[in-house]
From Swiss-Prot:
<keyword id="KW-0109">Calcium transport</keyword>
<feature type="topological domain" description="Vacuolar">
    <location>
        <begin position="1038"/>
        <end position="1084"/>
    </location>
</feature>
<feature type="topological domain" description="Vacuolar">
    <location>
        <begin position="258"/>
        <end position="273"/>
    </location>
</feature>
<keyword id="KW-0812">Transmembrane</keyword>
<comment type="function">
    <text>This magnesium-dependent enzyme catalyzes the hydrolysis of ATP coupled with the transport of calcium. Transports the calcium to the vacuole and participates in the control of the cytosolic free calcium.</text>
</comment>
<keyword id="KW-0106">Calcium</keyword>
<feature type="binding site">
    <location>
        <position position="691"/>
    </location>
    <ligand>
        <name>ATP</name>
    </ligand>
</feature>
<dbReference type="InterPro" id="IPR023214">
    <property type="entry name" value="HAD_sf"/>
</dbReference>
<feature type="binding site">
    <location>
        <position position="547"/>
    </location>
    <ligand>
        <name>ATP</name>
    </ligand>
</feature>
<dbReference type="GO" id="GO:0000329">
    <property type="term" value="C:fungal-type vacuole membrane"/>
</dbReference>
<feature type="compositionally biased region" description="Low complexity">
    <location>
        <begin position="44"/>
        <end position="60"/>
    </location>
</feature>
<dbReference type="GO" id="GO:0005388">
    <property type="term" value="F:P-type calcium transporter activity"/>
</dbReference>
<feature type="topological domain" description="Cytoplasmic">
    <location>
        <begin position="510"/>
        <end position="938"/>
    </location>
</feature>
<keyword id="KW-0926">Vacuole</keyword>
<feature type="transmembrane region" description="Helical">
    <location>
        <begin position="274"/>
        <end position="294"/>
    </location>
</feature>
<dbReference type="Pfam" id="PF00122">
    <property type="entry name" value="E1-E2_ATPase"/>
</dbReference>
<feature type="binding site">
    <location>
        <position position="981"/>
    </location>
    <ligand>
        <name>Ca(2+) 1</name>
    </ligand>
</feature>
Length: 1292
């Protein structure tokens, strides 16, 4: 047998992390004390009293705490998990050398002991069991027996939840000096079952938690409020405005305190010295803008942090105090006995106590595509010698983050949280998020508006500067006043740029998404990827599973039979067949079809049926308090059979029944087999029992029992048609049918069947064993449809969304249930998976529009269906709950996984988790998706209207003024900008869905953000607002008989402008031509609150703003003018909606404006006239649809480029990933694919996949093996879900 040198990676088999390429390197975690305990050398070693640390190859020494300091730290931190990261190696400065070799050998770890440590094993030693996999170390600690002894756990009963603070300390020598047999016998019959018990949690103060920690990662370092405010202040325009404000303040202070006062010509008294007020007011306004922006971002981060925590948490089954308990994955501790099964993503590191055909996909960790079959620790010890580090067929290790494909088992937890492999890797990969597609679309519009606004601001500055220079000779003012006038021109121009460049526009969608995802949780939609919320708004097709989604997943056996003549049905059910459906009901009556039919079964048949159901099942049982009746957890089909066994066959304890027989081999259910099986020894014979799809069971059965006895058997051939008729009759009644069969072997392994020499623990292959079976019986299982599904399907159809059923049931059952749900129509097509799969691409695309039901489908069929629908231009949402559904969930535009019945793999592959597994929740997701898109459009419509009015009003009034001053001052414009960018977004982005959103067809993918209805409202309202404000400014005094004092009228203009925006905000609550703009406004408290707050602040500004806001108190007539003109915008909006669009298309320059926007925001459009390339981006504001991740990055970079150059600030964070391309290009071409391959995405229980990641990582660590030396370069690694895609394709 091969051996592997610990110092030579080339001889080591593929492992979780090679010593040189892992990130972080194992040397950072090995050779460090597992907690703050004193450390000493085993007396059996050379006699030295302390361990000296080996220097790493880089020359750095690993930190070593003294005995006293560690003891003091431990005493001080009792009750708090130790901070292991404080002991991490300082070798990060030279990762290339530090990661090349472990600093602490296994021998050192085995002979290192810790005084006062309650457990024998340190965290570094437990990590070395699996990183890399090391069976020789398992031999050294005496296998599973030594491991359990060192962790103080009995695998038959689990840990105690009332674990004491251990007075007796366990040393490594106690384990190494134990010469007894390392094989540990686990007494499964000791396990009793118990329901979820809130008391079954390990205390945070226990030694186990203190020493090894909990299965929780530290919270992501979120940005604090001050940091977010500083980032908001990085806006280049705000910085420029701040500089101007400081200069203005300095000049104002000089004028106030350094110049003689100016006398009032009427009173002769000195005028108030307020020259400094404007500078202070501008700075105060900037502080308010920055503060509000920072608070807004801070609240958004808090919401997403809550979302991440909810996504990461799920329940697991553990063995504690001798009973099975359901607990949060966050409560797992080292020493727990964890139950795992197919579909789970392993949340911790551990060693297998028991394995029932466990097969894992470890590609996300090792990069190796082959699936790994696991064995328990005892078997691994038997198959290897102590000098062999690793053999592929003797692998008992489960690594956190890997996926269980088949089987089930029990796991002894050896590492949790930051000490597990997944935890260490995740902590090294935490990063910032990226922009969503809707943010990308908005950024393009923002860029166009920014260019127009920037041009307007520059034009204003140039015109005013020319006018200022022309008048300079005739200006008799002092040089200070001239400087103040010039500064006023600069301030007004810069402030106009603040208003005109919509920094808040690309970020407004984040607010809408944050609100929507938070509210969607209440509707049982847990959004994992933000873009899924947007995409659901354009969904045109839903491909839904049947079980649990359309049905209640509350399965009950209501009919069935044993052999040819013992039939039964539930008292509450109808007779099991229907004459009109072609079945012979008289045959049932003659056979005694009643619940008492079970009494006709012979004892032997009854026992065999019980063992067939109990042993060939992966369900676990729980007992409610003060109840002897078990409750089962697991597959709903299996729980239905077990419930029937309890009720009719006298089953009392499934665990006791399983432990009473010797299970030789177990075949877990798979989509290929459509069945599961088990071989067990019973009364000196070996029974092979199978349950599964009745067609498969009947096909492999050559005989059938009769008269309720195993002794009477007849040939199956003469009864085949009868059973097919029965199964068809059940299917027409929407019953799921299962068949049971068995076979008896006289010896084990059987002599007449070829054995599998490669795996002695599983000697038989399924295809060899599953032949020549005897048919036992069949069962009809009812799963009623959810009461609200037919209405939900009807609502989808009214919303232009086609619903299709994709199920593994037979076509008769599928059509029956689809008809009840309203999915299957008279002109619809139903088809089975194999037939659908065999069609040509052209034929498949031809029948897809009418395909309502796809039965007997495989994961491949579901993928083909999705691909075909997408080729036809559809946006497809799909549901899935199994591991094999992962590829389809990833392929769909939006993947929905089941929160209750779904596997962890399916949840990880999905975009949204249905917490209640209910189809109606998908309909709510569609409504929320459309509402998010509507919210962004509402905000866009509002902001562009304000932009147009503010820009033109400022330019016209400033140019027409004799002193180059605008009617709206800098402080007033900043107040308007605050209303426009933040408060309006809060108000308009938080409208809940209305029934109207599901009464219209979905938008086409890539549709323009602007509709004609939006354009006509923007143009008409802007024209009205400009007309009102300009007339008031230039003719208001004469029309309303005000004195020539401009202060009164300027205040009225400012007040009117703000009230126009406030009432137009109400107007913008609707995007269509319907008149009721107040619909469901009482459901949006935030909108009402913001309206009242803004109105209140405006009143305070006018009354008390004074010199700071350049306003003067106005009389009642002035207030009436302002508010009446504002209110008129509401009936005007109704009038605009009533005008036919065809008429306005001829009058309004919508096409010209749209073309100008498109020309500005996209160079592809400008080159369209001289290019015939069909791939060039569409006209108008329709976004370019990228086809690769690189195109996404390029598109984001291009779209936000102009805004970022002008503003910077928070926008800069959307462009971080652009560094990736540049720095990757700096690498040698031969290294690029290898660097990317080294860095793969994995799942962590504590970190949501809801955000994409991009992390600054020393590149020398990633490419040290490839190149040997690359200096100190750093790159941004932007990694996506490649690992999961790879994992999903492997599953398929």
């Amino acid at each position: 047998m091969p051996t592997y040198n610990d110092d030579d990676d080339s001889s080591r088999p593929p492992s979780v992390h090679s010593e040189r390429n892992q990130k972080p390197s194992s040397s950072q975690f090995l050779g460090v004390p597992s907690s703050n305990y004193n450390q000493r050398e085993n007396s059996s070693r050379s006699g030295s009293s302390t361990i000296s640390r080996e220097p790493s190859s880089s020359g750095t020494m690993y930190p070593m705490a003294s005995r006293d300091s560690m003891k003091e730290s431990y005493d001080k931190n009792k009750g708090t998990p130790p901070d292991y990261t404080s002991y991490v190696s300082h070798s990060d400065a030279e990762p290339e050398q530090a990661s090349s070799k472990s600093s602490t050998s296994i021998e050192d770890l085995l002979h290192t002991e810790y005084d006062d440590a309650p457990f024998a094993f340190s965290i570094p030693l437990l990590q070395r069991l699996q990183d890399p996999k090391n069976t020789s170390l398992l031999h050294a600690i005496h296998g599973l027996k030594g491991l359990c002894k060192g962790l103080k756990v009995d695998p038959s009963t689990g840990i105690s939840t009332h674990e004491p603070h251990y007075a007796d300390k366990l040393q490594m020598s106690d384990i190494l000096n134990d010469d007894s047999n390392p094989k540990l016998v686990v007494h499964l019959d000791r396990i009793r079952s118990q329901d979820n018990n809130p008391e079954a949690k390990v205390s945070h103060d226990s030694d186990r938690v203190k020493y090894y920690g909990k299965n929780v990662l530290p919270e992501h370092d979120s940005k604090g409020l001050i940091r977010l405010m500083l980032e908001a202040f990085k806006d280049k325009v705000l910085i420029l405005l701040s500089i101007a404000a400081v200069v203005s303040l300095a000049l104002g202070l000089y004028q106030t305190f350094g110049q003689p006062p100016t006398l009032d010509p009427i009173t002769g008294k000195p005028e108030p010295r307020v020259e400094w007020v404007e500078g202070v007011a501008i700075m105060a306004a900037i502080v308010i803008v920055v503060t509000v922006g920072g608070v807004n971002d801070w609240q958004k981060e808090l919401q997403f942090k809550k979302l991440n925590a909810k996504v990461s948490n799920f329940d697991v089954q553990v063995l504690r105090d001798g009973a099975v308990h359901s607990t949060s994955v966050f409560d797992l501790v080292v020493g727990d006995v964890l139950f795992v099964e197919a579909g789970d993503v392993v949340p911790v590191d551990g060693v297998l106590i028991e394995s029932n055909n466990l097969v894992l996909d470890e590609s996300a960790m090792t990069g190796e595509t082959d699936n790994i079959k696991k064995v328990d620790a005892n078997t691994a010890i038997e198959r290897t010698s102590p000098d062999v580090e690793y053999r592929k067929n003797a692998d008992p290790y489960l690594i956190s983050g890997t996926t269980i494909l088949e089987g089930n088992g029990k796991l002894l937890v050896t590492a949790v949280g930051v000490n597990s492999f997944n935890g260490r890797t995740t902590m090294a990969m935490r990063t910032e998020g990226q922009a969503t597609p809707l943010q990308l679309r908005l950024s393009r519009v923002a860029d166009a508006i920014a260019k127009l606004g920037g041009a307007a601001s520059a034009l204003l500055f140039i015109v005013l500067l020319i006018e200022f220079l022309v008048r300079l000779k005739s200006n008799d003012s002092s040089s200070k006043n001239k400087g103040q006038e010039f500064l006023q021109i600069l301030i007004v121009s810069v402030t106009l740029l603040v208003v005109a460049v919509p920094e808040g526009l690309p970020l407004a969608v984040t607010l809408a998404l944050a609100f929507a995802t938070n509210r969607m949780q209440k509707d049982n939609n847990l959004v994992r990827h933000l873009q899924a919320c947007e995409t659901m708004g354009t969904a045109t097709n839903i491909c839904s599973d049947k079980t649990g989604t359309l049905t209640q997943n509350r399965m009950t056996v209501v009919a069935g039979g044993f052999g040819t003549d013992v039939l039964f049905f539930d008292h509450n059910d109808e007779t099991p067949t229907n004459v009109d459906q072609g079945s012979d009901s008289s045959k049932f009556e003659d056979a005694g079809a009643s619940a008492f039919a079970f009494k006709r079964l012979s004892p032997e048949l009854r026992d065999l049926t019980l063992y067939s159901i109990a042993v060939n099942s992966t369900c676990r049982q729980l007992f409610e308090d003060n109840s002897d009746t078990p409750r089962f957890i697991g597959s709903k089909t299996e729980t239905a059979l077990l419930d029937m066994s309890v009720k009719e066959l006298g089953l009392t304890n499934v665990d006791s029944m399983r432990s009473s027989v010797d299970i030789k081999q177990f075949f877990s259910f798979s989509s290929d087999r459509k069945a599961s099986g088990a071989i067990f020894e019973y009364k000196d014979k070996y029974y092979f029992v199978v349950k599964g799809m009745p067609e498969r069971v009947l096909q492999q059965s050559t005989s059938v029992i009769t008269n309720g006895s195993l002794d009477e058997v007849e040939d199956m051939h003469s009864h085949a048609d009868y059973f097919k008729e029965m199964i068809t009759g059940y299917a027409k009644r929407s019953l799921r049918t299962l068949g049971l069969c068995y076979r008896v072997f006289d010896s084990w392994p059987p002599k007449d069947i070829p054995t599998n020499d490669e795996d002695s623990s599983n000697p038989l292959k399924w295809e060899d064993a599953f032949t020549d079976m005897t048919f036992l019986g069949f069962f009809g299982i009812m799963d009623p449809i959810r009461p609200d599904v037919p209405l939900a399907v009807k609502v989808c159809q009214g919303a232009g969304v086609t619903v299709r059923m994709v199920t593994g049931d037979n076509i008769v059952t599928a059509k029956a249930i689809a008809s009840q749900c309203g999915i299957y129509t008279e002109d619809g097509i139903s088809m089975e998976g194999p037939e659908f799969r065999s069609l040509s691409d052209e034929k498949r695309l031809e029948i897809l529009p009418k395909l309502d039901v796809l039965a007997r489908s495989s994961p491949l069929d579901k993928q083909l269906l999705i691909e075909g629908l997408q080729k036809l231009g559809n946006v497809v949402a799909v549901t899935g709950d199994g591991t094999n559904d992962a590829p389809a969930l990833k392929k769909a535009n939006v993947g929905f996984s089941m929160g209750k019945s779904g596997t962890e793999v399916a949840k990880e592959a999905s975009d949204i988790i249905l917490m209640d597994d209910n189809f109606s929740s998908i309909v709510k997701a569609i409504a929320w998706g459309r509402t998010v898109n509507d919210a962004v459009k509402k905000f866009l419509q509002f902001q562009i209207t304000v932009n147009i009015t503010a820009v033109f009003l400022t330019i016209i009034s400033a140019v027409a003024s004799t002193d180059q001053s605008s009617v709206l001052t800098a402080v007033q414009l900043l107040w308007v900008n605050l209303i426009m960018d933040t408060l309006a977004a809060l108000a308009l982005a938080t409208d809940p869905p209305t029934p109207e959103v599901l009464k219209r067809k979905p938008e086409k993918p890539g549709a323009s953000l602007f509709t004609f209805d939006m354009w006509k409202m923007i143009i008409c309202q802007s024209m009205y607002q400009l007309a009102v404000t300009l007339v008031l400014h230039f003719a208001g005094n004469s029309i309303f008989h005000y004195p020539s004092n401009t202060a009164d009228m300027n205040t009225i203009v400012f007040n009117t402008f703000v009230w126009l925006q406030l009432f137009n905000e109400i107007n913008n609550r609707r995007l269509d031509n319907k008149l009721n703009i107040f619909e469901r406004i009482n459901h949006n408290f935030l909108f009402i609150a913001i309206f009242v707050i803004v109105a209140g602040i405006q009143v305070i500004i006018v009354f008390f703003g004074g010199a700071a806001f350049s306003v003067k108190r106005i009389d009642g007539k002035g207030w009436a003018i302002s508010i009446v003109f504002g209110v008129i915008s509401i009936p005007l909006g109704a009038l605009i909606r009533c005008v036919p669009n065809n008429f306005l298309r001829k009058v309004l320059p919508v096409k010209t404006i749209d073309t100008v926007f498109s020309w500005i925001l996209n160079p592809r459009f400008r080159s369209k006239r001289r290019s015939t390339d069909h791939d060039v981006e569409s006209l108008s504001l329709i976004p370019y649809e990228p086809t690769s991740p690189n195109e996404v990055i390029d598109s984001i970079r291009h779209s936000l480029g102009f805004v970022q150059r002008i503003r910077g600030g928070r926008i800069r964070h959307l462009l971080n990933n652009s560094k990736f391309d540049k720095q990757m290009e700096a690498l040698p071409e031969r290294l690029r694919p290898r660097v990317k391959q080294r860095f793969m995405k994995i799942r962590s229980p504590s970190v949501s996949s809801a955000t994409s990641v991009a992390l600054m990582i020393p590149i020398s660590t990633l490419v040290s093996e490839a190149s040997g030396r690359l200096g100190g370069h750093d790159i941004w690694i932007s990694h996506n879900r490649q690992a999961l895609d790879k994992k999903s394709s492997n599953v398929h």
